[in-house]
Amino acid sequence: MSRRKKRVTGEQALRLEFESVDHQPLIDALGVDIPRELLVLALTHRSFANENGMLPNNERLEFLGDSVLGLSVAGQLYQQYTSSPESDISKMRASIVSRYGLADIAREINLGQHILLGKGEQLHDGRSKDSILADTTEALLGAIYLAHGFEIARDTVLRLFKHKIDTASATGLHQDWKTTLQERLAERNLEMPTYTSTVTGPEHEQTFTAEVAVHGTVLGTGVGTNKKLAEQAAAHKAVGFLQDNPAFV
């Protein structure tokens, strides 16, 4: 007589999926501990929750994290850019906390591999979707706030977003061409860009040249006094290329 295989409950599926990945590198990247229960919740996308018996998902934490993020960035911009009018710092904040800005940070800390997704989202490369990466980043910030309070959550935000905040007024009004390029590529369902750079000249007067490519095709080349500026210039050129070549896929 064959034995009927026991069905895995939603809670069991959640535990198995969560424990299949080592989350310590994520905790290290965030720079702050998160209690296991909150970490599990923050990483549980609604697709996984719905496929496994309507488990709790991270949307409420996302709501909380959005507020923590917005206030933290707004406060820092207010203090750091004392001569900028409200209209300018408002635009800076909007760009920094946008879906694409958040997804940028998520990729820097390799968040995608830690997210608990349903089978459908996994098949559609959900771990690389800007929307899922951004929402999960906010959920993690919400979890940090609940575990440690606003001050620690704010410090985490300012550490993760330091470069974006520090460069927000590089061109008067914030224009992050790398983020804009990611947005344009996502609209066409294209893979994220790759950057390569070279440096020439003496150490005290170096010139950096960067290329940005998609599918092995170079879309733009930029020059700058450091690597970041060169990559921004290359991304700017790539955005122009996409505007001039709407059929590029």
Curated annotation (Swiss-Prot):
One Gene Ontology cellular component: cytoplasm
GO biological process, one term: tRNA processing
HAMAP family listed in its UniProt record: RNase_III (MF_00104)
Protein name: Ribonuclease 3
Gene it is expressed from: rnc
Record field: catalytic activity: Endonucleolytic cleavage to 5'-phosphomonoester
Keyword Hydrolase belongs to the record: yes
One Pfam family this sequence matches: Ribonucleas_3_3
Domain RNase III: 21-149
The enzyme's E.C. designation: 3.1.26.3
UniProt similarity note: Belongs to the ribonuclease III family.
Keywords for this protein: Cytoplasm, Endonuclease, Hydrolase, Magnesium, Metal-binding, mRNA processing, Nuclease, RNA-binding, rRNA processing, rRNA-binding, tRNA processing
Organism, as annotated: Corynebacterium diphtheriae (strain ATCC 700971 / NCTC 13129 / Biotype gravis)
Entry-linked NCBIfam families: RNaseIII
Molecular-function annotations in GO: double-stranded RNA binding; metal ion binding; ribonuclease III activity; rRNA binding
Predominant place of localization: cytoplasm
